[in-house]
Regions:
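Short, acidic/polar
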Residues: 27-41, 84-99, 149-159, 228-234
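Active-site groove signature of glycoside hydrolases
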Residues: 95-118
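Conserved, mostly hydrophobic/aromatic
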Residues: 6, 18, 49, 62, ...
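Beta/alpha (TIM)-barrel catalytic core signal, keyed to glycine-rich beta->alpha loops juxtaposed to Asp/Glu
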Residues: 111-292
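A short, structured active-site edge motif that brings together acidic residues
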Residues: 72-83, 105-109, 169-173
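Acidic (Asp/Glu)-rich catalytic clusters
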Residues: 7-12, 41-42, 62-71, 92-101, ...
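Acidic-and-aromatic substrate-binding clefts and catalytic sites of carbohydrate-active enzymes
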Residues: 24-29, 52-60, 80-87, 114-115, ...
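N-terminal binding-site loop/beta-alpha segment at the start of enzyme catalytic domains
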Residues: 1-73, 129
Length: 292
């Protein structure tokens, strides 16, 4: 699988990160969960894991595999707690649940509005706890994540306030059809590239929302499911100036994502346009900016 340098971290991440949220979305036995980790890390060579304390029991599910893979993965986790004291306690809990002493990347989780950014960057906000974590050797790098229509704009402002090492925000062909979102994303990507910031993009398969329909996937948005759709969506995303994309929380599409990543080739500009034009949004999802 192709690798790309994750900004200033110096780590060459595989273009797909293992989204460990998938481990917390099911009640599978530990042996099966171990096999999912093995599929991603050992069989497909993924060397970057994304996880968060809010992803169900994903940390407990991943912990048994960590001693066998820790020396070959870049481990990123997050805290969604906004204040310093709560964030520090949350970070300590993450280490305990994962059974590790440190991680490679510690991120502010779900910062999607200016109000949330104000909360975490104020005196005694969560960012202070993360900075102190770096000083104590708990993490090497600091990042910010978020999703929603304002995420690119918020993250661009965040980079003005603090020199984050990485960002993580949504991008997919369906989301890109939102012109306002596309414009703000391009500004963020340009700034990130100029300042050697690692770029991670989530929601690679998002095509719309559920509305009043009954979800048939574990994701809170409606994802692409077929191999052809996944190929088109992932290849489009990886043809943009990003570094890596975490896999989704729906276990049935994980093998297809890995398959697509192994066969990735950069799309031509014409193919990129076609990938966007072919998108069909059965139901809009304003929470991701999918409005047409």
């Amino acid at each position: 699988m192709e690798k790309r340098l994750l900004g200033r971290t110096g780590h060459s991440s595989t273009v797909v990160t293992f989204g460990a949220i998938v481990l917390g979305k099911s009640n599978l036995p530990q042996k099966k969960l171990d096999s999912i980790v093995d599929l991603a890390i050992n069989q497909h060579g993924i060397n970057h894991i994304d996880i968060a304390p809010s992803y169900g029991n994903s940390m407990e599910a991943l912990a048994p595999s960590i001693p066998k893979i820790r020396n070959k993965i870049f481990l990123g986790t997050k805290t969604a707690i906004k204040d310093k004291k709560g964030a520090w306690e949350n970070i300590q809990s993450c280490l305990k649940r994962l059974k590790v002493e440190n991680v490679d990347l510690l991120q502010l989780h779900g910062i999607s509005t200016m109000a949330e950014l104000d909360q975490v960057t104020m005196k005694n906000g969560a960012l202070t706890a993360i900075v102190e974590s770096r000083q104590k050797g708990i993490t090497k790098w600091i990042g910010i994540t978020g999703h929603g229509p304002e995420a690119p704009k918020v993250h661009l402002e965040a980079l003005q306030r603090f020199d984050f090492d990485t960002i993580m925000f949504p991008m997919s062909p369906s989301i890109w059809r939102n012109e306002k979102y596309k414009i703000s994303s391009k500004k963020l990507l340009k700034y990130a590239k100029a300042n050697n910031v690692g770029i991670q993009c989530i929601k690679m398969l998002a095509r719309g929302g559920w509305g009043n329909s009954t979800p048939d996937c574990t994701t809170w948005y409606d994802p692409h499911r077929t191999q052809d759709e996944i190929d088109a969506s992932l290849w489009w995303l990886l043809s943009q100036p990003i570094h890596t994309a975490p896999s989704t929380g729906e276990i049935t599409v994980l093998p297809k994502i890995l398959n697509a990543a192994q066969r990735f080739y950069p799309l031509t500009k014409e193919e990129e346009v076609q990938a966007i034009d072919r998108q069909k949004t059965p139901i809009k999802e304003p929470r991701l900016g999918i409005i047409n």
